[in-house]
């Protein structure tokens, strides 16, 4: 047995990620990954110790891929939070198999870099505090808002990835934005504050006024 595999671990994970993206989670196995790489199963088994090990390491690898491709930071915490929601919609539209791998079915897991509420994480708690200060509400209200939007966005994403809902990206973005703005208004956030923080996007008003 060689002391180290000739094929890099990252290449194996990339091949597994592409396999899931193309054919779905059910197609993921060591033989299929080996076929993608044009090698035997030995180096993959050596690297991960079997399918359980491969799956365990593919999850954070896939999360980082989603973070890099679909999420980006914006000028304030609220805009960054909304971008994560838009990124989740993009993922469901563009890569439904990967969405299902991360969010639904046997391999169900919330993205740790996305909407998951990590209340024991000081960095995340600081984000909620900053959002509360921006919006003029309490951190508890921000957490309730975040959880509501997480459930709403996950629901939209699941319907998209399942092929049940077929609509344009722009309409999905508008639905997400309008729902968030309506919820925040219900918490007493001033219209002027929402206007400033959303960059002047009043799509909710224009759509409701016909």
Where do the model's predicted regions map?
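Short hydrophobic/aromatic patch on the recognition helix
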Residues: 37-48
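Amphipathic alpha-helical packing segments from all-alpha helical-bundle domains
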Residues: 67-70, 109-136, 143-148, 174-188
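Hydrophobic alpha-helical segments that form the core
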Residues: 140-162, 173-182, 197-205, 209-210
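Short hydrophobic clusters on alpha-helical segments that form packing/core surfaces
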Residues: 12-20, 62, 66, 88, ...
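Short secondary-structure transition hinges
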Residues: 90, 94-135, 158, 165, ...
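Hydrophobic alpha-helical connector segments
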Residues: 57, 71-98, 139, 146-149
């Amino acid at each position: 047995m060689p002391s180290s595999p000739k094929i890099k671990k990252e290449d194996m994970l990339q091949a597994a990620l592409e396999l899931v993206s193309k054919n779905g989670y059910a197609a993921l196995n060591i033989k299929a990954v080996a076929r993608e790489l044009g090698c035997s199963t030995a180096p993959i088994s050596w690297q991960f110790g079997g399918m359980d090990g491969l799956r365990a390491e593919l999850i954070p690898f896939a999360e980082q891929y989603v973070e890099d491709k679909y999420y980006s930071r914006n000028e304030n915490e609220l805009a960054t939070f909304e971008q994560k929601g838009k990124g989740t919609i993009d993922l469901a539209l563009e890569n439904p198999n990967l969405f299902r791998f991360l969010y639904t079915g046997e391999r169900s897991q919330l993205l740790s870099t996305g909407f998951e509420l990590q209340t024991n994480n000081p960095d995340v708690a600081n984000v909620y505090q900053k959002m509360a200060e921006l919006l003029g509400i309490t951190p508890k209200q921000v957490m309730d808002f975040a959880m509501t939007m997480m459930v709403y966005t996950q629901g939209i994403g699941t319907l998209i990835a399942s092929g049940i809902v077929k609509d344009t990206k722009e309409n999905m973005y508008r639905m997400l934005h309008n729902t968030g703005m309506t919820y925040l208004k219900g918490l007493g956030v001033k219209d002027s504050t929402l206007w400033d923080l959303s960059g002047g996007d009043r799509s909710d008003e224009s759509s409701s006024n016909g």
